[in-house]
Every structure is written in C-alpha cells, then in structure tokens.
Amino acid sequence: MIEASKLKAGMTFEAEGKLIRVLEASHHKPGKGNTIMRMKLRDVRTGSTFDTTYRPDETFEQAIIETVPAQYLYKMDDTAYFMNTDTYDQYEIPVANVEQELLYILENSDVKIQFYGSEVIGVTVPTTVELTVAETQPSIKGATVTGSGKPATLETGLVVNVPDFIEAGQKLIINTAEGTYVSRA
C-alpha cells in the first residue's frame, strides 16, 4: 500500500478497479482546512486523463510494473507497433496510450515496454533523444544564446523552444522528461 502523499509523477497504482499512472502531483494547503494532494492522472488502459484530489493519508495498492527492452517499429492508424529485442515478440499499443512518448521516438528507436502482469500498459523513452529540426524561423545573424528563443517543429511533430541560432535540418538533443532543448547534437 502507498499513501497519496508519497505518489510522484510516473508512479502507477490501483484505485476503484482502474490502473492509474500519476502525471503530476502536488501538495496544496488551502487557507482553511487540511492539506490535499492535487493530481493529474491517466487511466492506463483507456488513455484518458483526469484531475482529482486526495487526502494525503489515503492509501492505494501500488502496481508492480515490469519493463523489457524493445524497439519502436512503426505506427499505423490508431496503433503503434513495438518489438521485444530479447524475444522478438511484437506488441500492439493504442496510440492514445503512448501519444506523448511517440513525440520523442523515431522508427527503430530503443525504448522499454511496461507490463502489468501480462498486459502491455506503456512505453518508457530514454531521458534524452536526438531529433532533427523540420521547421523553424530563419536564424538571425548575430543571435546569441541569451535571446528568448523561437519555436521549432521537430521531425516527430514535437514543438520546442530553441535558441535563435538553430536552423532547419540541425540535430538537437531533447530532454524527454520536460520536452525541452538541451543542446545541438
């Protein structure tokens, strides 16, 4: 059992017959009354997200999640296809369940598939990835790192804020936890 006050982003637990992943969690102390936990959660099976609050002392059954190394193969219609790199088993995951993760991976990228029992529930991407800039405003001569930056669309469709000197076609290192530019590759 785990208390609501100990839940952090990325953890998975069971509540009301649902398998739920924490996307965001924060303590909130209203002016009057007891502390509450505000959380943004995702139902792992359906992919739907919702906001809720819990008392810090509420307890939940923590889900035991196993991970296996895998490779992203391709996406067709509403399904993403992955292959276990140890056993070569292939897995189909609804795009709604891995929509955010697909913004950070290309075909043949290495990932980790998450299992709850024998059920595939999600994908973990590396902490940083290398992606190419597909489209951005032209760079400004004399631009420095200290500028406010500009939006750039990457090859996966992800939009990140980058320094003014970045041009289309350049490879960038992206932090997948925050969805931010780290450096040029």
Swiss-Prot record:
Keyword terms of this UniProt record: Cytoplasm, Elongation factor, Protein biosynthesis
Name under which the protein is recorded: Elongation factor P
The keyword Cytoplasm is annotated on this UniProt entry: yes
GO CC terms: cytoplasm
Gene name for this UniProt entry: efp
Matching InterPro entries: Elong-fact-P_C, NA-bd_OB-fold, Rib_uL2_dom2, Transl_elong_fac_P/YeiP, Transl_elong_KOW-like, Transl_elong_P/YeiP_cen, Transl_elong_P/YeiP_CS, Transl_elongation_fac_P
Subcellular localization, as worded in the UniProt entry: Cytoplasm
Family annotation (SUPFAM superfamilies): Nucleic acid-binding proteins, Translation proteins SH3-like domain
GO MF term set: translation elongation factor activity
Species this chain originates from: Streptococcus pyogenes serotype M4 (strain MGAS10750)
